[in-house]
Swiss-Prot record:
The gene is coaD. Belongs to the bacterial CoaD family. It comes from Dictyoglomus thermophilum (strain ATCC 35947 / DSM 3960 / H-6-12). Homohexamer. SUPFAM superfamilies: Nucleotidylyl transferase. This is Phosphopantetheine adenylyltransferase. Keywords: ATP-binding, Coenzyme A biosynthesis, Cytoplasm, Magnesium, Nucleotide-binding, Nucleotidyltransferase, Transferase. ATP binds at residues 9-10, 17, 88-90, 98, 123-129. Its main location: cytoplasm.
């Protein structure tokens, strides 16, 4: 059984993330979507809220499970004996950062490999930050995130969606 880990903050999960997860689930026997507790980032949503949104968004993909971690990704990989990291690339600018991360992970855990999946063209502009900014002003985020996530965003910002 070949497993892969797809790490991220998922603050919140977007349809771009889900696209990468669905495609990864067709390649690997199991995908572990790993919510990072990154001390350098101040998330909008709590860990519990992010896990809840992922559970709702990924419930129809049978070979996906969700977990969370704090610390080095490679320590988590060793602990569960997984050697594959999936990362999505939206643009060339993503590659430079992701390549550096992949090399660092390889240095710390020589057995691990990072597999890059190129985003679907319709999601190349999409990021959690973009979605949060649009939602904070009540802008329409339909098609950018699952409906459940959109509800949670508008609720968090205390706004009603415009033009939906």
């Amino acid at each position: 059984m070949i497993k892969a880990v797809y790490p991220g903050s998922f603050d919140p999960v977007t349809n771009g993330h889900i696209d990468i997860i669905q495609r990864g689930a067709k390649i690997y026997d199991e995908i572990i979507v790993l919510v990072a507790e990154n001390i350098s980032k101040k998330p909008l949503f709590s860990l519990e809220e992010r896990l809840d949104m992922l559970e709702h968004s990924l419930k129809d993909i049978p070979n996906v499970r969700i977990d969370h971690f704090s610390g080095l990704l490679v320590d988590y990989l060793r602990k569960i004996n997984v050697k594959i990291i999936i990362r999505g690339l939206r643009a060339v600018s993503d590659f430079e950062y992701e390549f550096q991360q992949a090399l660092t992970n390889k240095k710390l855990y020589p057995d691990c490999e990072t597999v890059f999946l190129v985003s679907d063209l319709k999601y190349t502009f999409l990021s959690s930050s973009v979605v949060k900014e649009i939602a904070s002003f009540g802008g329409c985020i339909k098609g950018l995130v699952p409906d459940y996530v959109a509800e949670k965003l508008y609720e968090k910002f205390g706004v009603k969606p415009k033009g939906v």
